[in-house]
C-alpha cells in the first residue's frame, strides 16, 4: 500500500528571492511614474471618476495603510529626517484619512545624552482638495509626482513637497512648519512578481505557491516600492521652543519608499528592521520583516546598493534572517532587547548605534487604528530609531536605522 506524503503548506506568499546576478529576472527596475502611484487610489481609479477622498477608495473589509516616505541625510551638517504622508482606511472605511509625520534628528551630538531628537510631530490632514494617483493636495500639504520628459542625471521624475502648518496649530514644541523641496528621483525597483507579499486566508501547497497564480494573492498584503537614491533641493523651516530652525537642502541624498499594509500592524509582522545609508558616492538600503506565527514566522529581507544615478545591486531572501544583533540592551519598561550594534546584508555593519528616538509605533497612527490594536493582547509595539555617522565599503556617510518590535 502506497503511503500518502503530506504536502507542506503555507498561508504566506513572499516576494521572489534574488540571491545572485542569475536571479535578475526576479526583480524589476523602473524609471516611470506608474510605479509611484498611490496603490490605494490606483486599484480603483477606473471605477471612480471623482477626486473625492471618500469615493477614491472602495470599501474592503480589511484595514489598509499606505505610506509615502522620504528619508533624507544632509551630509554637510549631519541633519537627517523623514517626511511621511500616511493614508489609512480602517475596517472597510469606518475611518479614512491622511496624516503627516515629520521628524528631524542629528547624526551626532556634543551632549552625553542617549536620546537626542530635534523634532517629531504628527498632523492630521483635513480639507483634501485633490487625491489623484500621483498627487495629494490639501490646504496645508501637497505631495505631487511630476514625470520628467527625458530621463537623465536629473532622474526620471520629481516629487514636489510643500507644507505650511500655521502657527498655533500644533504643540508648543513646534510651530510655523514650512517645507518647500523638490526631490529628483533616480532609478527605482520592486521585487517580483509585483512587490507584494500576500497573507492568504487558506493554506496552499508549495507547488501552488511556485505557480504564482490567483491562489497566491490576496487583498491582505505588504507591498514595497523603492527609489533607493535621489537628491533633495529646497528649504525646511520651523520654530522649536520659539527658536527658528532652517535647513537648506542642496543635492541632499535621499531614499523614497512606498509601503502598503493590508492588515493592522500587529497582524502584518512581529518585528521589522530598516537601514537607510547615504554617502557621497553610494547608498545602501535594507528592509526586513518577520510575519506572525499564523503566517509561519517567515522573514523577508530586501536590500539594494546604488550610486548617484543608478542601482548597482538588488537582493532579497526568505528566512535567511540576514539582519543580526551582535549586542543588545534590554528596555526595562517593555522587556524588548533592542540592538546596540547591528549588521545588514552586503557587509554593512554599525557597531556603535546611537539611539535618537524610542516610541510606541501606534503613536504614528491615527487614534482610531491605535485604539483597535491597543485592545489586543500581547501588544508592546515600540520602534527604536538610530542615527549616526557610518562607513560602507570605501564611502563615509550617515545611516538611519530602525528596529521595531510589535508582539
From Swiss-Prot:
Listed InterPro entries? Ceramide-binding_SVF1 (IPR051385), Svf1-like_C (IPR033394), Svf1-like_N (IPR013931)
| Any one GO CC term of the record | cytoplasm
User: Per the record's keyword annotation, is Ubl conjugation included, yes or no?
Assistant: yes
- Point out the cross-link Glycyl lysine isopeptide (Lys-Gly) (interchain with G-Cter in ubiquitin) in this chain: 22
Q: Extra info from the record?
A: Present with 3990 molecules/cell in log phase SD medium.
Q: Which family does it belong to?
A: Belongs to the SVF1 family.
PANTHER family cross-referenced by the UniProt entry? CERAMIDE-BINDING PROTEIN SVF1-RELATED, SVF1-LIKE PROTEIN YDR222W-RELATED
Spell out the protein name for this chain.
Uncharacterized SVF1-like protein YLR225C
Q: What species was this sequence derived from? A: Saccharomyces cerevisiae (strain ATCC 204508 / S288c)
Amino acid at each position: 500500500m502506497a503511503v500518502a506524503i503530506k504536502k507542506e503548506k503555507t498561508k504566506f506568499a513572499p516576494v521572489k528571492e534574488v540571491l545572485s546576478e542569475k536571479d535578475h529576472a526576479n526583480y524589476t527596475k523602473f524609471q516611470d511614474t506608474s510605479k509611484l502611484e498611490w496603490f490605494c487610489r490606483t486599484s480603483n481609479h477606473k471605477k471612480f471618476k471623482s477626486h473625492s477622498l471618500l469615493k477614491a477608495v472602495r470599501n474592503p473589509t480589511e484595514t489598509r495603510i499606505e505610506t509615502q516616505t522620504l528619508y533624507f541625510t544632509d551630509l554637510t551638517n549631519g541633519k537627517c529626517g523623514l517626511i511621511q504622508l500616511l493614508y489609512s482606511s480602517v475596517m472597510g472605511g469606518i475611518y479614512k484619512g491622511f496624516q503627516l509625520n515629520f521628524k528631524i534628528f542629528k547624526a551626532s551630538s556634543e551632549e552625553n545624552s542617549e536620546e537626542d531628537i530635534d523634532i517629531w510631530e504628527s498632523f492630521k490632514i483635513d480639507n483634501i482638495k485633490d487625491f489623484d494617483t500621483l498627487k495629494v493636495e490639501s490646504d496645508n500639504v501637497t505631495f505631487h509626482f511630476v514625470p520628467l520628459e527625458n530621463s537623465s542625471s536629473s532622474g526620471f521624475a520629481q516629487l514636489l513637497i510643500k507644507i505650511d502648518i500655521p502657527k498655533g496649530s500644533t504643540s508648543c514644541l513646534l510651530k510655523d512648519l514650512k517645507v518647500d523641496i523638490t526631490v529628483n528621483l533616480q532609478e527605482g525597483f520592486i521585487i517580483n512578481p509585483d512587490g507584494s507579499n500576500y497573507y492568504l486566508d487558506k493554506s496552499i501547497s508549495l507547488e501552488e505557491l511556485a505557480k504564482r497564480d490567483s491562489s497566491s494573492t490576496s487583498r491582505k498584503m505588504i507591498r514595497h516600492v523603492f527609489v533607493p537614491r535621489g537628491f533633495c533641493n529646497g528649504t525646511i523651516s520651523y520654530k522649536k521652543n520659539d527658536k527658528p530652525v532652517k535647513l537648506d537642502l542642496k543635492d541632499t541624498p535621499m531614499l523614497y519608499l512606498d509601503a502598503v499594509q493590508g492588515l493592522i500592524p500587529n497582524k502584518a509582522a512581529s518585528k521589522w528592521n530598516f537601514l537607510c545609508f547615504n554617502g557621497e558616492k553610494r547608498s545602501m538600503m535594507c528592509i526586513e520583516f518577520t510575519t506572525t506565527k499564523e503566517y509561519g514566522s517567515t522573514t523577508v529581507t530586501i536590500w539594494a546598493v546604488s550610486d548617484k544615478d543608478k542601482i548597482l545591486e538588488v537582493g532579497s531572501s526568505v528566512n535567511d534572517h540576514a539582519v543580526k544583533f551582535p549586542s543588545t540592551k534590554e528596555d526595562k519598561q517593555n522587556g524588548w532587547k533592542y540592538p546596540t550594534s547591528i549588521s545588514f546584508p552586503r557587509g554593512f555593519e554599525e557597531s556603535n548605534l546611537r539611539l535618537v528616538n524610542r516610541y510606541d509605533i501606534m503613536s504614528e497612527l491615527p487614534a482610531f487604528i491605535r485604539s483597535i490594536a491597543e485592545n489586543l493582547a500581547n501588544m508592546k509595539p515600540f520602534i527604536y530609531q538610530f542615527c549616526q555617522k557610518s562607513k560602507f565599503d570605501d564611502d563615509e556617510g550617515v545611516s538611519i536605522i530602525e528596529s521595531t518590535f510589535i508582539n
